[in-house]
Amino acid sequence: MEKSWFNKTSQEVEQELKTDCQNGLSSNQVQENMKKYGLNELQEKKKDSLLKKFLEQFKDFSIIVLIIAAIVSGVVGVAQGEGFTDTIIILIVVILNAVIGVAQESKAEKSLEALKKLSSHASKVIRNGKEQVIPARELVPGDLVIIETGDYIAADLRIIEAVNLKSQEASLTGESVPVEKITEKIDGNEIGIGDRKNMLFSSSLITYGRGKAIVVNTGMNTEVGKIAGMLDNAEKQETPLQQKLNDLGKTLGIACLAICAVIFVIGLLQGKEIIDMFMTAVSLAVAVIPEGLVAVSTIVLAIGVQKMVKKHAIVKKLPAVETLGSSTVICSDKTGTLTQNKMTVEKVFCDDELQDVKKVNTTEDFKKLVYNCMLCNDSRLLEDGQLAGDPTETALVDMAFKLDYEQSIYRENPRVEEVPFDSERKLMTTVNKKNGKYIVYTKGGVDELLKCCNSFLYKGEVRTSINNYAKWIRENNEKMAKDALRVLAFAYKELDHMPSKAEMKTIESDLTFIGMVGMIDPPRIEAKKAVEKCKKAGIKTVMITGDHKVTAVAIAKKLGILKDESEALTGTELEKMTDEELTKNVRKYSVYARVSPEHKVRIVKAWQENGEVVAMTGDGVNDSPALKTADIGCAMGKVGTEVAKEAADVILTDDNFATIVSAVEEGRRIYDNILKVIQFLLSCNVGEVIVLLLATLFAPQIGQWFGISDITMIQVLLPIHILWINLVTDTFPALALAFDPANKDIMDRKPVKRNEGIFTKGRTFRIIYQGLMIGLLTLSAYLIGLGTTHTAIDGLTLEQTKIEVGQTMAFIVLAFSELIHVFNIRDNKNSIFKTGILGNGVLILAILASALLMVVILFIPQLRTIFSIPILPSDNIIETIVLVLSPIVIVEIMKLFKVNTTRDE
């Protein structure tokens, strides 16, 4: 069972770890403990090799189908003496897809490495009775550590000496305010990390004071280490797009086998040769499977990734882009994600009224308050203009600077004496000299300070009998506390002489109360708009934080995340719920406060059990397991811990919650465009299948109508024609669809459900009827070619000439009608005359490039030979143009009568 150190006295810890609270460990003890516990390091998960990453790309069912098609094509090619041309083309596509996937993962890893800090931390310890500085990785349990302001804590420590010690633990607990530390033991066993005030934890920062502590846990045994261990056990689900494309691949694979089997049997019944029917079946297989779909989908995602970089998001894995677009719930950490992670003064009580700091009246009383904020303060201004020190104190100085108070105030009012803050008095006092006078400035908790005051400032006057006025002060204190503001009170008195040491002992008496300030880690300005945008888009925002409930609720109300406090739940309340109860009730809650890393994972899983696609944002170590469990984890790049970045799928380089919403919008655009690609490629492929099916089924009749005695010659398209169209002619326009801009209403519609497949009622209807349209147009071209050819070409019989002219017309009409058809795909509702054809310049270039490649094949003799294409007779050109332009006319008529879409679209 794991040891608890917070409920032991300093002496018990000292005895159990065999250390010395004065002299620390001996050299021999250090060596023994190093052997026993190892280095103070987190175990890094071994990164996959390039080969493993490459092989991972071949798991998709659609890729497996393509590989099988390549093998079959190779076998048939050898049997027919045509070589491996088809096989090589298919394998190039498969390998290209894998290379793109690996390249993106490697690129994201490099970007992540660039974000990592290169600094290595050191710790000051006492060993053998002497102080020494050692690398933090060499700390062992039992080490006696000296702690000072600004120190980074590199192991879990039990405090044995503390002088005004405060620690910033936001990255671990989510609490935005530094925690005051104590040395006394804490009774109880079930004490949350945030309430173990006699402990210091790895990854936290000392913001104030000094002390000594004993190392109790290192490496993977620290609280941070336990979280890192949870990451290895976190399950990662397939993204919605991966699931849908895999389902699509299986559907196409089954359809391919079924169609091939039917055609093979029909052909044999018609008396055709087995090898001929095998070739026809291969042609059908090639026609059914959209060879370019996987590569195009990958490239569409890669293009989306590049756009995301410009929007301050680094995507580690390609499918993550689309998952963002499918998100239905965003679970967000509060501190540093929804808030600025910077304490800021919001309210001021001065001149007898509670005022917004931005609208405060700059009276003489307020001036005294600001001087107190600046001078009774231990924060310091760095050379780069940044403030360093306790966040509460830096907030006070920041307020003064924003109100144009100058640094010269420090020079004109030098500090000559002080009484430091301590947790018992909850007060801090300085004595500052100005123009021969001595002014005592005191700040602290409201109740503690009022005990030291016998008068108060009231609109420029000093008034006595503070007791009645104290009620009004406390009422305003409560108002600020209800808004989750941290309140500090300020008082002063003037002396005509430098106080003696004896006088300093009672200096905090007979003070004049000036006023109070209320501060909070405020919401990001852009976060409220982002939350509103999420609501419009049908996405629920959930706040999950380690901070106190009152603070979380106040921030959530300001952001519009919750309306009523009943929507908030604490970690203690959550602990009492079973997983089943949480799954059943998870929709009731919008805010979770004082939760642990384990709780965050449970919340994410509960939403997933309800069929939601969950995005999780955060920056702390405490967010990491949930980041990995979520469908999409988004870590903050600037202040995010390395553990969080490793666990995430996306890293937001500007630490901005609004960026996640922009990323969702980009994800939706990409998903829409992938659906356009699928509809385009499948409708084209269905057209090819219909042509081959009809030609095979009605081969005897076609032979009879057009005087072709050998019906085995009747083949509308050769395998090389289909491959060329699928891999070259169609691929460029399909790729260009990736650049289609988002629809204006893209963030005004509900997210796509996780279980909604690609083949919705409307999309299935469009794929079938548009495929039928392309198939019949292509077959018509073939039949026209057969029927209008009356003269044999040199070296060919008339029958052979008819077949080649028919195939040429079919090839041209199929290729060019599909290029025209891509304009229909861009918008299923609105007419092309409304949307225009120039909205996507890349698409225009892609169509021109594909058309140019077709022209090259048609007019270069060597290529015509490879593709078995004769020169097209001039008297067939008019019919060809009419057939090529027909898809636009047909689909426009369907749109006009509103039958291109279903009611639910």
Enumerate the language-model features and the residues they cover:
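Conserved cytosolic headpiece of P-type ATPases
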Residues: 1-751, 756-759, 772, 811, ...
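Helix-coil boundary and interhelical linker segments in multi-pass alpha-helical membrane proteins
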Residues: 697-717, 784-806
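Generic alpha-helical transmembrane segments
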Residues: 729, 807-822
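Membrane-water interface at loop-to-transmembrane-helix junctions
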Residues: 755-772, 800-809
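Pore-domain transmembrane helices of cation channels
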Residues: 775-776
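A C-terminal functional module that forms or caps the active site or interfaces directly
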Residues: 825
